[in-house]
Amino acid sequence: MSIVRMTDLDLSGKRVLIRQDLNVPIDNGQITSEQRITASVPTIKLALEKGAAVMVTSHLGRPKEGTWSEEDSLAPVAARLTTLLGLDVPLVRDWVDGVDVAPGQVVLLENCRMNVGEGKDDEALARKYAALCDVFVMDAFGTAHRAQASTHGVIRFAPVAAGGPLLMAELDALAKALDNPAKPLLAIVAGSKVSTKLELLSNLVNKVDQLIVGGGIANTFIAAAGHDVGKSLSEPDLIPTANQIVADAKARGAEIPLPTDVVVAKQFLPDAEASVKSLDQVDADDLILDIGPQTAAHYAELIANAGTVVWNGPVGVFEFEPFSHGTETLARAIAASKAFSIAGGGDTLAAVDKYAIAKDVTYISTGGGAFLEFLEGKTLPAVAALEARGQ
C-alpha cells in the first residue's frame, strides 16, 4: 500500500486538517454513544504532540447543504472533545475561506456536509479545503467509500495527503484478513436478504475456504438445496443465484456448509415458542429464526480450526432470547479462537457488545458501508486517492 502515513510525517509548525468520522447519535442535544469521538482522540493528540496547528472536521447526519441547523451541529461533539482532550476546542461555523489556529491548538470545523458542493465532490470546494492546510489527514474509514469534497477531492489538492492511524489500522486489518490470510479463511455472512449481500457473497466465495451463511440469506440457500423453509424470510427468485454461488465454491474446493437443524417458531415474537427441528421436519407454517444446536456446534468447530475469521451478521434473530443461541455460540467460538478475527457491520457490533467479546476479537471494524464495500472487492475512492498521492 503506497499511502503516506501521518505517523511518519514531521508536523512541527504545520497546519493539519484531519477528516474524522464524528457522526455520533445525538438525542435532544445529548450524545448517546461517543465511541467514534473516543476513537478519534489519539489521532488528534498525536498531531498536537508533533507540534501541529490542528483543524478537525466531520459530517453529522444529513443536513441540507447551504443551511445551518442546530440539530446537525457538531457543538455537542466540540464540548465532548474539550473534556476528553483537556483543552478548549472551539467550534468554527464559517470556515471554508480561512481558519485561525496556532500550533498546540485544536479547532473543530462545523459539519462539512453543510458546505455547498460537499456531496458532489465539487472541485472548487475541495481546493478551498486544501488551501487551509499544509497536511490533510484522512482518518474516517467509515466514509472512505464516498467520493465527497472532504473525503476525496481535498486529497487530490492538499500539499500533502496522508492516511491517519484509524484509517490505516482498518486497512491493515482488512488486508491481513483478505489479501494475505492465515488459512483456512472462514467468513460468516448473515442478514435478511441475499440481494443486499449478493456482491459480498460473490466476491468472498472466490477467496474463502468456508463460507457460513445465516439469517434470511441461509433460508434462500436451504431452499436452493431443495428443503422446505415454510413461511421463513427467503428470496425464491434468487435460488438460481444461490446455486451458482454454491457451484463456484465447489469448483475451487471451498465449502458452504448448510444447517442440519434449525430453531423454528410459528410467530415472529420475542416470546414465541421455539422448537428445534431437523431440516426435513420444517412445516409449511414454520418460521426459521436461528440455527440449531447441532449446527452451531459444527460451525463453532470450523471456527476453532480457522486461521482467519471474517464476521458480518448474526446468524439468527439474536435480539429475541429464544433465537439468540446460535449467534452466541459462534460469537463465543470466535472469542475463544486463536484465529485472526475481524468483525464489522451494525448488527454484528451489537452482538459483540451483547456477549462482551470485544477484547477477544482481533479487530472490530467501525466502517459500516465502507467495510462491506471493501469485502465486496470494490475500490474505495478515498483509499484510491491516497494511493495515487503516495506514488
Swiss-Prot record:
Q: What is its EC number?
A: 2.7.2.3
Keyword hit for Repeat:
no
Taxonomy, superkingdom: Bacteria
The signal sequence is none
Pathway, per record: Carbohydrate degradation; glycolysis; pyruvate from D-glyceraldehyde 3-phosphate: step 2/5
Catalysed reaction per UniProt?
Answer: (2R)-3-phosphoglycerate + ATP = (2R)-3-phospho-glyceroyl phosphate + ADP
Residues annotated to bind ATP: K197, E319, G345, G346, D347, T348
Q: Tell me where in or outside the cell this protein is found.
A: Cytoplasm
EC supergroup of this enzyme: transferase
Alphabetical keyword list? ATP-binding, Cytoplasm, Glycolysis, Kinase, Nucleotide-binding, Transferase
Single GO molecular function: ADP binding
Q: Which residues bind substrate?
A: D21, L22, N23, R36, H59, L60, G61, R62, R113, R146
List GO terms (cellular component aspect).
Answer: cytosol
GO BP: gluconeogenesis; glycolytic process
Main location, first listed in the record: cytoplasm
Tell me any Pfam family this protein matches. PGK
Under the heading InterPro entries, the entry gives: Phosphoglycerate_kinase, Phosphoglycerate_kinase_CS, Phosphoglycerate_kinase_N, Phosphoglycerate_kinase_sf
What interactions and quaternary structure are annotated?
A: Monomer.
Instruction: Give the family, as the similarity comment puts it.
Output: Belongs to the phosphoglycerate kinase family.
Q: What is this protein called?
A: Phosphoglycerate kinase
Q: Which gene encodes it?
A: pgk
